[in-house]
């Protein structure tokens, strides 16, 4: 088997394709969360604090002349939201998996032959 055919076989496996789709969706989701933080959360929740500090964005928060802790705070908020949403997605998937799994069948009772044998033995003992 040639190098390229092996690579093609590897690349077309379900797990690799699923992983690639997950990475692409994750990157797009990261952009959505970043926009949510910068365009919704920061203006709504942090607006009073930013106005008091005479700043327009959280990224402008600095300390000691150059430490940009505003960018760090933005990244932390971003991470917390992404982690929480992923937790909710995984929790929903696990809940759906539990519904899909059929309960184990009840233990099988005695077969017809075993019942007949028991009846025969009971009749013999009388």
UniProtKB/Swiss-Prot annotation:
Transmembrane region(s): 17-37, 70-90
Cited SUPFAM superfamilies: Gated mechanosensitive channel
Membrane topology designation: Multi-pass membrane protein
Xref: InterPro entries: Mechanosensitive_channel_CS (IPR019823), MS_channel (IPR001185), MSC/AndL (IPR037673), MscL_channel (IPR036019)
Annotated localization: Cell inner membrane
Record keywords, A-Z: Cell inner membrane, Cell membrane, Ion channel, Ion transport, Membrane, Transmembrane, Transmembrane helix, Transport
An example Gene Ontology molecular-function term: mechanosensitive monoatomic ion channel activity
GO CC terms of this entry: plasma membrane
Domain of life: Bacteria
NCBIfam families (UniProt xref): mscL
Protein function: Channel that opens in response to stretch forces in the membrane lipid bilayer. May participate in the regulation of osmotic pressure changes within the cell.
Subunit structure: Homopentamer.
The family this protein is said to belong to: Belongs to the MscL family.
Protein name: Large-conductance mechanosensitive channel
Source species: Flavobacterium johnsoniae (strain ATCC 17061 / DSM 2064 / JCM 8514 / BCRC 14874 / CCUG 350202 / NBRC 14942 / NCIMB 11054 / UW101) (Cytophaga johnsonae)
Upper classification of the organism: Bacteria, Pseudomonadati, Bacteroidota, Flavobacteriia, Flavobacteriales
Gene: mscL
């Amino acid at each position: 088997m040639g190098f390229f055919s092996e690579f093609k076989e590897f690349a077309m496996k379900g797990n690799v394709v699923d992983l690639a789709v997950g990475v692409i969706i994750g990157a797009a989701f990261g952009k959505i969360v970043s926009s949510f933080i910068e365009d919704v959360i920061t203006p709504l929740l942090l607006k009073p604090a930013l106005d008091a500090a005479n700043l327009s964005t959280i990224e402008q928060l600095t300390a000691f002349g150059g430490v940009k802790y505003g960018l760090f705070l933005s990244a932390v908020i971003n991470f917390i939201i992404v982690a929480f949403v992923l937790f909710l997605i995984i929790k929903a998937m696990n809940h759906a998996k539990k519904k899909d799994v059929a309960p184990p069948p009840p233990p099988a009772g005695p077969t017809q032959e075993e019942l007949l044998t028991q009846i025969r033995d009971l009749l013999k003992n009388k």
